[in-house]
Each structure stands twice: as C-alpha cells, then as structure tokens.
Design a protein with these regions (language model features):
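ATP-binding N-terminal substructure of ATP-dependent carboxylate-amine bond-forming enzymes
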Residues: 1-105, 137
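Hydrophobic residues in well-ordered beta-strands that form the structural core
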Residues: 30, 101-103, 129, 152, ...
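Short gly/pro/ser/thr-enriched loop/turn and capping motifs at secondary-structure boundaries
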Residues: 35-39, 108-111, 158-159, 219-220
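Phosphate- and divalent-cation-binding pockets in alpha/beta enzyme and binding domains
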Residues: 39, 88-89, 141, 174, ...
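Active-site nucleotide/adenylate-binding loops and adjacent lid/helix of ATP-dependent enzymes
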Residues: 109-192, 205-208, 233-245, 249
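Phosphate-binding core of ATP-grasp and ATP-grasp-like enzymes
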Residues: 179-184, 191-233, 241-267
Length: 267
C-alpha cells in the first residue's frame, strides 16, 4: 500500500501517523516544503521517499511531485495531510489521481456552515436559525427575522476567526464597517449556553463508527478568542445518550468514511 502524506513534518505532533504507518509495513511517501535534513530522524526513517517542493500552495508543483512518486512507486492508495489547512489540496490531488477519499465537491458540506446546518436539520438535530449574508440588505433582513443577539462568522471558515458578536444596533453598524463585503458570512442566533460538549471518533472505510468519545470544554471558542484565555477540556467517562444519538445521526447524514470526526454541541 502506498500512502502519501502531505506536509509530513508539520504539525510535528502529527509525525507519529507516518511513523506508525511505516511500522505496519505501509510504504509512506511524503511531499513537503521543509528540506529533507530538517525532518526529525524518526520521521525520515519512516518515509520511503520525500519530495521537497518550494511551495505547497502551488498546486501545479505539488501535482508534478505526486506524478513523479506515482511513476516511481506505482499507484497511490491514500493521500492525507491530517491537517485542516490542506483539506482542499488533499481533495484536489485525490480527484486528479483517482485516489480513495473526499473530493473537492465532498468538502462543501463540511467547509460551509450553511451547508452543515442543512445536514444537521436532516439528521434531526436541533439547530438555531441562521442566514447567509452576502449584502447589507441580507444583514438588515437577518436582524429583523432572526433578531439580536446574533453571532456572525465567515460561512467558509474554522474556529472563531473573524467572528463578530452582534448584540446592539451599534454592533451591527460596526460589522458593516469592518466587513470587506466580499467574504460571505453566516449569521446565527446567539446561544447563551457556556457549556460545550463534543462527539469525537473514527469511522472505517464503510462509514461505521469504530471509536467514539466526548469532551467537555472549560470555555467556549468565542470566550477564548475575546479574552485570550488558555483552553482546557476533559474526557467524560460516560456519554450522554442524547449526545450519542445526535452524533451518530450526524455522522451517518454526512456520509463520513475513513475519517476522524469532531462535532461540537451546546448543552
């Protein structure tokens, strides 16, 4: 089996994936920006071959690297970066080289908050109202129909980056002034709960959950961003049956296969 890892060096705590794959007898190939000499010795020893590119952002350069490895080692069975930043690159390479896994079209349902909400609804999970924001008229409509307070985040984005909490008309005007009007936003009714729990785990290539667990967060992502706090969380010994029901329904609705999954809920 040929397993291609994109950016095997960074993040460093993910290097163990490559090391353990090699320990299982899998041929691990790597493409990254770092010089070969910079790779930690255990990682170097796990890679059958490492192809350095000048810029992982240059998809044509990366495709040429994949083509070379394909020619030298035979068909690539998997392409993974284990890094959210490179999801689109991973998907584009899989499509180009006909490799198992998520393709660009598949990412739409996990990268856009508006699309995720549609699937949450289909899975029977309670959600707060939301609206896609492309114009200032959309902003005014959301204020009228959803009502303040609301949370405003880029529709395509992760975490709490570029997030606005809208509680007053002044907050709305501030958002309009700061907004570049090209980034599509997603507004949602603000949830006052400070308790966040998660449904995390792994699915096999057929979409069956083979491991699941749950975390409780000490702080919300928004509080972490606003107050520059340190994050902490703990694993619960027992999972709330309602959380398991919702989590399993979401995983099934999204059609996840051979993936880690991480889903956050307000309690």
């Amino acid at each position: 089996m040929n397993y291609l890892v994109i950016s095997p060096y960074y993040p460093q705590n993910f290097q163990q994936f490559s090391i353990e794959l090699a320990n299982k007898g899998i041929t691990v190939l790597g493409i990254g920006q770092e010089p070969y000499e910079q790779l930690d010795e255990p990682l170097r020893n796990s890679l059958t071959e490492y192809f350095r590119v000048d810029n992982l952002e240059n998809i044509d350069e990366v495709k040429r690297a994949v083509a070379f490895l394909f020619y030298k080692h035979g068909p690539i069975d998997r392409i993974e970066s284990h890094n959210e930043y490179w999801l689109e690159l991973d998907a584009a390479l899989r499509e180009q080289f006909h490799v198992f896994g998520a393709k660009p079209e598949d990412l739409k349902k996990t990268k856009f908050k508006s699309e995720m909400k549609k699937l949450f609804k289909k899975a029977g999970v309670p959600v707060v109202p939301g609206a896609v924001i492309e114009t200032e008229a959309d902003v005014d409509k959301a204020v009228k129909e959803i009502g303040l307070p609301m949370i405003a985040k880029p529709d395509n984005g992760v975490g709490a980056a570029a997030t606005f909490k809208l509680e007053t008309e002044d907050d709305v005007n501030h958002f309009k002034a700061e907004w570049d009007h090209s980034t599509i936003y997603f507004f949602e009714k603000f949830v006052t709960s400070s308790e966040i729990c998660t449904f995390d785990g792994l699915v096999d290539r057929d979409g069956n959950i083979v491991f699941s667990t749950t975390f409780d967060y000490a702080h919300t992502p928004l509080d972490l961003m606003i107050y520059k706090m340190d994050n902490s969380y703990y694993v619960l010994k027992d999972m709330d049956p309602k959380l398991r029901k919702y989590g399993e329904a979401i995983v099934k609705e999204f059609g996840m296969k051979e993936r880690f999954f991480h889903i956050e809920f307000f309690r």
